[in-house]
């Protein structure tokens, strides 16, 4: 019988409580020195299928051969740039300087309270006057869930996305050029690239320590104490309190998680190429642009997911994969 093993459950994610909102938030962005561009996008998870593609991984046993790869389908209709927000830095850290809002934001009436007057010209002058102190240029973009048949919501999801590349003036000018317009994901990422996928996981509610942390069920005499699914010990005699590392019952799921370096297998516009017979379970048919991501991603169907340029990419050669077949078989069993 094995007497020594790693502790049950990871200590990397604490406190294990529910996320504050359904829209994931990024605290960091990758470095980029090229032409100004957006570093993120968002879509809605439709479901999973599989593709048959040519294995282009160097020195792989199946290099050059057909392999079956599971993929996640994300529906990505165009997003609209609602505002520009610039940050300056002082002794207390970064804080917003001002914002430039676009006109005709009736679509956001259910999400924010619109100001009676739009002082975009005054805000633009203020930013240009302090452009030497600007450290970050962000844009506020919102999704269009009304264009999706699989997502039963009307209110857009509003989020902040970083503009990277070039000087602060170049980034601000680029943000002004796309203010109030629709942006497509194809202008940001391409097939074969790697991206970070962030979402809010499935909520499991209040769960015990066995399911939440994977602790071992108590056996023999200990199981007959009617505490078969309890932790074996709450800790030592001293210190005289239960430490936070002890597996305890509590909230499980509905937490923000990021998966790094997920490969983009395909970006397309014709949804008939990937819609399975009968549609995706708990979602339906994809009717807009879509992206296929290798592997699984956090969250259930219909859940908003954010896509960011890879932060831990390293130096890897980018090449578009050769997809020979996309499964259209029914997912209903």
From Swiss-Prot:
Question: Which InterPro entries has this protein been placed in?
Answer: L3_arc_euk (IPR045077), Ribosomal_L3_dom_3_arc_sf (IPR044892), Ribosomal_uL3 (IPR000597), Ribosomal_uL3_arc (IPR019928), Ribosomal_uL3_CS (IPR019926), Transl_B-barrel_sf (IPR009000)
The function of this protein is:
One of the primary rRNA binding proteins, it binds directly near the 3'-end of the 23S rRNA, where it nucleates assembly of the 50S subunit.
The protein's name is Large ribosomal subunit protein uL3
Superkingdom is Archaea
Q: Which family does it belong to?
A: Belongs to the universal ribosomal protein uL3 family.
NCBIfam families assigned to the protein according to its UniProt record, in alphabetical order: L3_arch (TIGR03626), PRK04231.1 (NF003261)
Question: Where does the signal sequence lie?
Answer: none
Q: Which Pfam families match?
A: Ribosomal_L3
- Gene3D superfamilies per the record? 3.30.1430.10, Ribosomal protein L3, domain 3 (4.10.960.10), Translation factors (2.40.30.10)
- Residue ranges annotated as coiled coil are none
What keywords were assigned to this record?
Ribonucleoprotein, Ribosomal protein, RNA-binding, rRNA-binding
* Subunit field text: Part of the 50S ribosomal subunit. Forms a cluster with proteins L14 and L24e.
According to the UniProt record, one GO cellular component term is: cytosolic large ribosomal subunit
GO MF, any single term = rRNA binding
Listed under GO biological process in this entry are: translation
């Amino acid at each position: 019988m094995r007497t020594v093993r790693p502790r049950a459950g990871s200590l990397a994610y604490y406190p294990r409580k529910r996320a504050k909102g359904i829209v994931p938030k990024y605290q960091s962005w990758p470095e980029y020195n090229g032409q100004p561009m957006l570093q993120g996008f968002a879509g809605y998870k439709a479901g999973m299928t599989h593709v048959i593609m040519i294995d282009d991984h160097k020195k792989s046993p199946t290099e050059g051969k057909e392999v079956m790869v599971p993929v996640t389908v994300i529906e990505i209709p165009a997003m609209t740039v609602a505002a520009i927000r610039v940050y300056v830095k002082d002794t207390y850290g970064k804080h917003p300087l001002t914002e430039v809002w676009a006109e005709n934001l009736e679509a956001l009436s259910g999400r924010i309270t619109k100001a009676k007057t739009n002082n975009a010209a005054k805000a633009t002058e203020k930013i240009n006057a302090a452009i030497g102190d600007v450290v970050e240029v962000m844009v506020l973009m919102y999704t269009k869930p009304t264009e999706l048949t699989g997502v039963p919501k009307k209110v857009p999801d509003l989020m902040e996305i970083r503009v990277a590349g070039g000087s602060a003036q170049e980034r601000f000018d680029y943000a002004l050029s796309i203010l109030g317009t629709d942006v497509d994901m194809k202008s940001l990422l391409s097939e074969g690239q790697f991206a970070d996928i962030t979402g809010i996981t499935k909520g499991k509610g209040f769960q015990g320590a066995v399911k939440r942390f994977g602790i071992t069920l108590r056996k023999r005499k200990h199981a007959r104490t009617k505490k078969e699914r309890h932790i074996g010990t709450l800790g030592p005699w001293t210190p005289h309190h239960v430490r936070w590392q002890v597996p305890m019952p509590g909230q499980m799921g509905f937490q923000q998680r990021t998966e790094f370096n997920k490969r983009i297998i395909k970006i397309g516009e014709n949804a008939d190429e990937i819609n399975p017979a009968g549609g995706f379970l708990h979602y339906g048919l994809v009717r807009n642009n879509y992206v296929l991501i290798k592997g699984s991603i956090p969250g259930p169907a219909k859940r908003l997911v954010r896509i960011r340029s890879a932060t831990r990419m390293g130096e890897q050669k980018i090449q578009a994969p050769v997809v020979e077949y996309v499964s259209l078989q029914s997912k209903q069993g």
